[in-house]
UniProtKB/Swiss-Prot annotation:
Binds 1 FMN per subunit. Belongs to the pyridoxamine 5'-phosphate oxidase family. Catalyzes the oxidation of either pyridoxine 5'-phosphate (PNP) or pyridoxamine 5'-phosphate (PMP) into pyridoxal 5'-phosphate (PLP). Its cofactor is FMN. The keyword Oxidoreductase applies. Pfam families: PNP_phzG_C, PNPOx_N. It comes from Paracoccus denitrificans (strain Pd 1222). This is Pyridoxine/pyridoxamine 5'-phosphate oxidase. GO terms for molecular function: FMN binding; pyridoxamine phosphate oxidase activity. Its EC number is 1.4.3.5. The gene is pdxH. Substrate binds at residues 54, 115, 119, 123, 182-184. One of its GO terms (biological process) is pyridoxine biosynthetic process. Pathway: Cofactor metabolism; pyridoxal 5'-phosphate salvage; pyridoxal 5'-phosphate from pyridoxamine 5'-phosphate: step 1/1; Cofactor metabolism; pyridoxal 5'-phosphate salvage; pyridoxal 5'-phosphate from pyridoxine 5'-phosphate: step 1/1.
Length: 220
């Protein structure tokens, strides 16, 4: 019998993630949507940085986590090469965290356009001016480029082709809550219905699992 209840209860990990994030937005002093995004470079070395989660889409069957960035940045190049990423969100005020691993795809251009248009004008110009992750002579050089582009692009710049969004489609989601004496609670959700695996099962005449996610309590 499962002892998964309280803040861990439910049959949709994306609903749980939304609930935790909403609670964190009421208790964290700033950037409750900050997440440490991990990728792997061409040499197999891990890389990590903080980015902002902008949406939790869908539900158990098709959910994803969305963020936006420069496609030509280090993280963009690494994601394009590997198609995978992981992230962790940790909230000190709640003493909880969420870990996610999965495959990554680009969001639709129309969605990226809409989000880009919602940003402050200076941020939109900055997306054009910054050659993210590449060497920069000085901050003065960057601000000069921002000023130049501010004049040439006007008040309604279009989205740069090198800037847009990514969706992380999880294969694993772990929910963690602090416990006394380091006896934490951890529940790992693992997606059990990979399309390739299901196709192989169907080809062999075997039954395809009906449960989309398998949930396992982990030792702290």
């Amino acid at each position: 019998m499962s002892d998964r209840g309280g803040i861990f209860a439910g049959d949709d990990p994306f609903a749980i993630a939304r609930s935790w994030l909403a609670e964190a937005e009421r208790t964290e002093p700033n950037d409750a949507n900050a997440m440490a995004l991990a990728t792997v470079d061409a040499d197999g070395l891990p890389d990590a940085r903080m980015v902002l989660l902008k949406d939790i889409e869908g539900g158990a069957a098709d959910g994803s986590f969305v963020f936006y960035t420069n496609y030509e940045s280090a993280k963009g190049v690494e994601i394009e090469a590997t198609g995978v990423a992981a992230f962790v969100m940790h909230w000190k005020s709640l003493r909880r965290q969420i870990r996610v691993r999965g495959h990554v795809t680009r969001v639709e251009p129309e969605l990226a356009d809409a989000y880009y248009a919602s940003r402050p004008l200076q941020s939109r110009i900055g997306a054009w001016a910054s050659r993210q992750s590449r060497p920069l002579a000085s901050r003065g050089a960057l601000m000069a480029e921002v000023a130049r582009l501010g004049i040439s692009l006007g008040l309604n710049p279009s989205r740069p082709p090198h800037w847009g969004g990514y969706r992380i489609h999880p294969v694993q989601i772990e929910f963690w809550a602090d416990g006394a004496f380091r006896l934490h609670d951890r529940f790992r959700w693992t997606k059990s219905s990979y399309q390739g695996e299901n196709s192989a099962l169907r080809d062999e005449g075997q039954e395809v699992p009906q449960s989309l996610w398998q949930v396992c309590r982990l030792s702290p």
